[in-house]
Every structure is written in C-alpha cells, then in structure tokens.
Amino acid sequence: MGGVKLFATKESLFSARIQWALKLKGVEYEFILEDLANKSPLLLKYNPIYKKVPVLVHGDNVIVESLVILEYIEETWKEHPLLPRDSYDRATARFWAKFNDEKLVPPVWTACTGEGEAQEKAKESVLESLALLEKQIEGKKFFGGEQIGYLDLVLGWISYWISAVEEAGGNKVLEAEMFPSLHQWGQNFIHTPLIEECIPAREAFVAYVQYAIIYIRSISANKP
C-alpha cells in the first residue's frame, strides 16, 4: 500500500486525534508540518475542497476530515481496536464524537477568548455540553473503559487545549470542581505517555493562542 503521511499542525486539536490514533496503533508515519498562513501545494492538492488539516495519505489513498480519518485508521490497522465491539456502543461513541465537533468545539474559542454578551452565551453553551459529558464519564477511567478508545481521542483536546486557551484569553470555563469526573479523565488521558508525546509544549502553545487572539480581534476591530 505504501507509506503513511500526515499533513497537520502541532496546534490543531483535529490533527492531534489522528497522531494519537496512529501512535496507539503502532503505525509509523511521516509528520508533515503545515503553515496554515501559507498552505503547501501538496495540502491544496490533497484537500482541494476544505483546504485544511489534517490530511492522511496512505499510499495512493488520500483521506480528509478527522473523524473520517479515524474510521479509516480503525478499519485499516486492526491492532489496538479503538471502537467498541458492540454495535450499539459503536453508534453511541460516534454520536458523542459528532456532538463534540458540532456542539462543543465551535463555542469554546469564544467562551475562552471572547468579550461581552457573545462570550457569556458561548460559555453557557460550553458548560451545558461539558455537563452532558460529565455524566458520560462518571465512574469510568476512560470513555472507552479501562483503555483509551475512539471517543477519548476525539475528546482528548479537552485535557490540555481548553486550559491553554483559558490562560491565553483570560476566561475560565472548565472548573475541576464543577466537572470532577471529566477533570480526572483528562488527567488520566494527558499523562498517558503515547498521548503526551503529541501535545505541544505549553508555553509555545499559549503564545500561539495569544497571537491568534490578537490577530482575530484586530480583524474584528477593522470591520466596517
């Protein structure tokens, strides 16, 4: 089939889940760092519709969109299964993965870095979503049980990404006291060696987010 290449950025929460999956599966791959301000011709060639990371190239196969890539990885490399065996449990995991990408991820940035009424509304939405996930993880080490699974990889960004964006933006969203089970899960997840390997250095990541905040706010301020 050929080698495996991952076009990604170190900061992308969607790229991280693919790195984690490949690591857990023991798949050797080439990490190709993309600059989203100056996208490479190969990235635009492989993902001409969305023009974004991550992109997985496996021989002649090109796969885009992180949840689709995770499914491809699961079906191609059988070692360390990520999805549950039971069909209902698999469907449930996929439901919460979609919930994460559609309901939780979009408002988090505004909740942590926004201002005024928009920030308050976004924070309310995020807290509602986190409360639902808190119920799902109660009494469990991981969403996948005793081992890291598909849903842990999808939600893994919560364990480090939110706190870094909170620090950069100055707004607290994820309080350990409000979501103790989710907080403990995050600690279990982030301190797993294979997971920790793919997390960007804290100081550099916070600096990256701070720059992004300044850039986005400057664009908003200059809008007519």
Role assignments for model-derived ranges:
Residues M1-Q147, I214-P224:
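GST-like domain detector, emphasizing the conserved glutathione-binding G-site
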Residues E74-K78, D101, E138, S159, ...:
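Hydrophobic/aromatic-lined pockets within catalytic cores
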Residues A122, A131-L132, S159-A164, W185-P224:
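Non-globular targeting/processing and membrane-anchoring segments
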Residues K135-E146, A168-G169, P193-I199:
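Surface-exposed helix-capping loop/turn segments at secondary-structure junctions
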Residues L83, K172-A176:
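Membrane interface segments of multi-pass transport proteins and intramembrane proteases
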Residues P48, S87-Y88, Q147-I148, L153, ...:
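Short capping/connector residues at structural and topological boundaries
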Residues K39-S40, T113, K172, R202-A207:
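Short amphipathic alpha-helical segments embedded in low-complexity Lys/Glu-rich regions
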Residues K103, G145-G169, E177-H183:
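GST superfamily/GST-like fold recognition
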